[in-house]
């Protein structure tokens, strides 16, 4: 197991980011705060799109942004869910805003983006349960996220390239499967008309 090896060094997330903070949700009772031009990320967007988020279902307006604690998260930032689906992580490919349920991080070194993404996924599966605050809904807070320790190894770029190649292959196979399913549906509908 790669992450069970001894790391060269360990750094806390807060030491790897230029900016890291939760978002905010504009009041839902003010219609003018919504349906603007600013993409507004939801857990649903993250679960549907996976690693890279390229669009959002909801949008907020400039007024919605100004009248909440939401902020514009620049492209190629890491976004981690602190409430629902705790620990779910994505990389945004477009600037967007998030709710207070998400902690967004702008990294100091963009070359580490994929590595930290992969590590946070591993962390979610193996360790995040130890950090959960219990209550009506288990969650973590921003300070907990900032203090997550990230191990660094001498060959992480090779590791990342290997995982990216696997991801690319999986995505290609999913695309092929989707096309085959479409072809099957078309042929069946042609046969029975």
What are these regions, as identified by a protein language model?
Residues 1-24, 40, 154-155, 164-191:
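Non-catalytic DNA-recognition/assembly elements of restriction-modification systems
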Residues 3-49, 64-69, 130:
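Low-complexity, Lys/Gly-biased intrinsically disordered segments
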Residues 21, 81-84, 107-110, 121-128, ...:
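Hydrophobic alpha-helix feature that most strongly marks membrane-spanning transmembrane helices
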Residues 42-43, 58-122, 133:
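A short beta-sheet element
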Residues 47-59:
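Short, basic/aromatic beta-hairpin or loop at an interaction surface
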Residues 82, 96-103, 133-157:
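A short glycine-rich beta-alpha junction/loop motif
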């Amino acid at each position: 197991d790669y992450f069970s090896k001894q790391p060269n060094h360990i750094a806390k997330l807060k030491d790897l980011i230029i900016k890291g903070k939760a978002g905010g949700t504009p009041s839902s009772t003010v219609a003018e705060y919504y349906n603007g031009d600013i993409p507004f990320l939801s857990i649903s967007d993250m679960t549907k799109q996976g690693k890279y988020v390229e669009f959002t279902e909801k949008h907020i307006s400039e007024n919605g942004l100004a009248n909440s604690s939401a902020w514009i998260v620049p492209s190629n930032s890491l976004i981690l869910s602190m409430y629902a689906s705790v620990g779910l992580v994505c990389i945004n490919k477009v600037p967007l805003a998030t709710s207070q349920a998400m902690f967004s991080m702008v990294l100091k070194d963009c070359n580490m983006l994929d590595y930290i993404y992969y590590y946070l996924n591993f962390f979610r599966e193996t360790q995040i349960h130890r950090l959960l605050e219990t209550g009506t809904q288990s969650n973590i807070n921003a300070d907990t996220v900032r203090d997550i320790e990230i191990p660094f190894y001498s060959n992480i770029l090779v590791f990342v390239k290997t995982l990216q190649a696997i991801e690319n292959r999986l995505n290609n196979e999913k695309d092929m499967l989707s096309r085959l399913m479409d072809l099957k549906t078309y042929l069946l509908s042609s046969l029975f008309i």
